[in-house]
From Swiss-Prot:
Major subcellular site: host cell
Pfam families per the UniProt record, alphabetical: Flu_PA
Keywords: Decay of host mRNAs by virus, Eukaryotic host gene expression shutoff by virus, Host cytoplasm, Host gene expression shutoff by virus, Host mRNA suppression by virus, Host nucleus, Host-virus interaction
Entry's free-text remark on domains: The probable endonuclease active site in the N-terminus and the basic amino acid cluster in the C-terminus are important for the shutoff activity. The C-terminus acts as a nuclear localization signal. The C-terminus is recruited to host protein complexes involved in nuclear Pol II RNA processing.
UniProt name for this protein: Protein PA-X
Physiological role: Plays a major role in the shutoff of the host protein expression by cleaving mRNAs probably via an endonuclease activity. This host shutoff allows the virus to escape from the host antiviral response. Hijacks host RNA splicing machinery to selectively target host RNAs containing introns for destruction. This may explain the preferential degradation of RNAs that have undergone co- or post-transcriptional processing.
Family of the protein in this entry: Belongs to the influenza viruses PA-X family.
Site positions (Important for efficient shutoff activity): K202, K203, K206
Molecular function GO terms recorded: RNA binding
Membrane-spanning residues: none
Site feature (Important for efficient shutoff activity and nuclear localization) residues: R195, K198, R199
């Protein structure tokens, strides 16, 4: 899975995902499925904001890469991918400037056109179930929620999908491609199934002798980037317990 992530995603996204995991004591080389999940979420956030600008009249326009429109204002502020301190600094600045209510949890984006924060979710389950879980957690009508799935489904607050159909189709196509590429490498089942992931992790760790370089301290903290992906992948408490149960050198 680690090789797939490094081949499939932009190096900048990979680097940001590594930093996010390491900040919370998580090892991308061990928790490779989580690594892939964070990269996927980051890429969706970046694709969401790509090519979208606000012109001098305050209207939202789409400008393809390479067009000479440097004076245009980006429609979306990307919050996801920043370290927590900087992310909250950006959020506070936006709230002070616009008067928008400060969110309880770090959102992923801010939409300058609609003047609202956006929470992006990526899931393989029923989108409406994940949407309700996300809404129940956030408990704020001020934060707009937009959920994507690997099957091409989506759900958004009040059926307001923010982006044009073509931009959303680009994201859906990318998610479908990731799924197909994982499946072709035999990685998809373990990526979405905790039971299969447990079996694969046990198999991988048994093949490592001696147990050199494996982490001794197990983290029970959940990284912000991963929270938006649950339950696409196991939460860190379950992952940590699983990892702790298998990080034992085989008896001679």
């Amino acid at each position: 899975m680690e090789d797939f992530v490094r081949q499939c995603f932009n190096p900048m996204i990979v680097e940001l995902a590594e930093k996010a995991m390491k900040e919370y004591g998580e090892d991308p080389k061990i928790e490779t499925n989580k690594f892939a999940a964070i990269c996927t979420h980051l890429e969706v956030c970046f694709m969401y904001s790509d090519f979208h600008f606000i012109d001098e009249r305050g209207e939202s326009i789409i400008v393809e890469s390479g067009d000479p429109n440097a004076l245009l204002k980006h429609r979306f502020e990307i919050i996801e991918g920043r370290d927590r301190t900087m992310a909250w600094t950006v959020v506070n600045s936006i709230c002070n400037t616009t008067g928008v209510e400060k969110p309880k949890f770090l959102p992923d984006l801010y939409d300058y056109r609609e003047n609202r924060f956006i929470e992006i979710g990526v899931t393989r389950r029923e989108v409406h179930i994940y949407y309700l879980e996300k809404a129940n957690k956030i408990k704020s009508e001020k934060t707009h929620i937009h959920i994507f799935s690997f099957t091409g489904e989506e759900m958004a607050t009040k059926a307001d999908y923010t982006l044009d159909e073509e931009s959303r189709a680009r994201i859906k196509t990318r998610l479908f491609t990731i799924r197909q590429e994982m499946a072709s490498r035999g990685l998809w089942d373990s990526f979405v199934s905790p039971r299969e992931a447990k079996r694969q992790l046990k198999k991988d760790l048994k093949s490592q002798e001696p147990c050199v370089g494996l982490p001794i301290k197990v983290s029970h903290r959940t990284s912000p980037a991963l929270k938006t992906l649950e339950p696409m992948w196991m939460d860190s408490n379950r992952t940590a317990a699983l990892r702790a149960s298998f990080l034992k050198c085989p008896k001679k």
